[in-house]
């Protein structure tokens, strides 16, 4: 007969296995409950990105900023809270597109598809709409009832981050160095505000001089002057999802400090070189990293809720 301690251990193992099973996401989650969910999301995203290519980057960023703060739970969509954090305030975009998608999905499947899953699918569809690779999005996330502004301030990478800080930041989310470099490649699309690259323009030496001169015209040195002026993160092909971001780094044309540190004599130099010359390798690493990121601490089963309106709890 088993001892009490061994029975307790067996129960703990069983509970852990059940917990792991419940946390598993599935590519077929909505096949029965809402079979047209993915096609509805894709149509809305494609239309939004075709209308404004920058929106693709904004939707990818929403998913990233969601997953890095208490997991992929759509907490970033709740009004206030995380939206007021330093890395998000005045720069997060795409809420109107998400709201439009949610309205369309609710019309065909009431309270079935989570806002967290909408973000994950919209990120994939945005990349595809801009010519990038596709991947299978695992589904079944549920929406949080809380958000965490303080965690958004501490856990989201800053544009001034050092390489060591970036590696540590991603590692704490279960993402390795290759994941970090690959996910940074999302900066092949989108734009950044002058206030986030001004210091690099005027105070750093590992920047192409012609590149810096061109940017200074729209980003004056005085703080407070032109802070919100925009520049593309990838000046070569700003609206195409490709590997030009890495090629730019090889020429010291990274816009943000946190971009150029990936190629500055450090441990990630070879990965940048590889992704620059081998688009297939970048695409493979990027899609794998997006799946891993999308699996950060999801709410599943009966956890959380399926919000009716992405900006507020039910």
UniProtKB/Swiss-Prot annotation:
Glycosylation sites: 148, 169, 203, 274, 309
This protein's record includes keyword Disulfide bond: yes
Signal peptide boundaries: 1-23
Protein residues bound to heme b: 187
Binding site for substrate: 157
One cellular component term from this protein's GO annotations in UniProt: extracellular region
Catalytic residue positions: 65 (proton acceptor)
InterPro entries with a match to the protein in the record: Haem_peroxidase, Haem_peroxidase_sf, Peroxidase_pln, Peroxidases_AS, Peroxidases_heam-ligand_BS, Secretory_peroxidase
Family, as annotated: Belongs to the peroxidase family. Classical plant (class III) peroxidase subfamily.
Protein name as catalogued: Peroxidase 2
Organism, as annotated: Oryza sativa subsp. japonica
């Amino acid at each position: 007969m088993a001892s009490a301690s061994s029975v307790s251990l067996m129960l703990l193992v069983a509970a852990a296995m059940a917990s792991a099973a419940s946390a598993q996401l599935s590519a077929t989650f909505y096949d029965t409950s809402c079979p047209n969910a993915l096609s509805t999301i894709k149509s809305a995203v494609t239309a939004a990105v075709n209308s404004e290519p920058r929106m693709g980057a904004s939707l990818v960023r929403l998913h990233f900023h969601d997953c890095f703060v208490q997991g992929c739970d759509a907490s970033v969509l709740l009004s206030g809270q995380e939206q007021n954090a330093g890395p998000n305030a005045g720069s997060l975009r795409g809420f109107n597109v998400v709201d439009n998608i949610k309205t369309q999905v609710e019309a065909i499947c009431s309270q079935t598809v989570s806002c967290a899953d909408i973000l994950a699918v919209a990120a994939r569809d945005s990349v595809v709409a801009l010519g990038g690779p596709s991947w299978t999005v695992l589904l079944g996330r549920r929406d949080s009832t809380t958000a965490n502004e303080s965690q958004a301030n501490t856990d989201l990478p800053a544009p001034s981050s050092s390489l060591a800080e970036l590696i540590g930041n991603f590692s704490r989310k279960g993402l390795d160095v290759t994941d970090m470099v690959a996910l940074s490649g999302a900066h092949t699309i989108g734009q950044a505000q002058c206030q986030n690259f001004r210091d690099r323009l005027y105070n750093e030496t590992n920047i192409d001089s012609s590149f810096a001169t061109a940017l200074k015209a729209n980003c004056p040195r005085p703080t407070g002057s032109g802070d919100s002026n925009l520049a593309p993160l990838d000046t070569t092909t700003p609206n195409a999802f490709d590997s030009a971001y890495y090629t730019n780094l090889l020429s010291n044309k990274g816009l943000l400090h946190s971009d150029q540190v990936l190629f500055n004599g450090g441990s990630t130099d070879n990965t940048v070189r590889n992704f620059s010359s081998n688009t297939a390798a970048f695409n493979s690493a990027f899609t794998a990293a997006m799946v891993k990121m999308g699996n950060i601490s999801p709410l599943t089963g009966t956890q959380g809720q399926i919000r009716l309106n992405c900006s507020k709890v039910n």
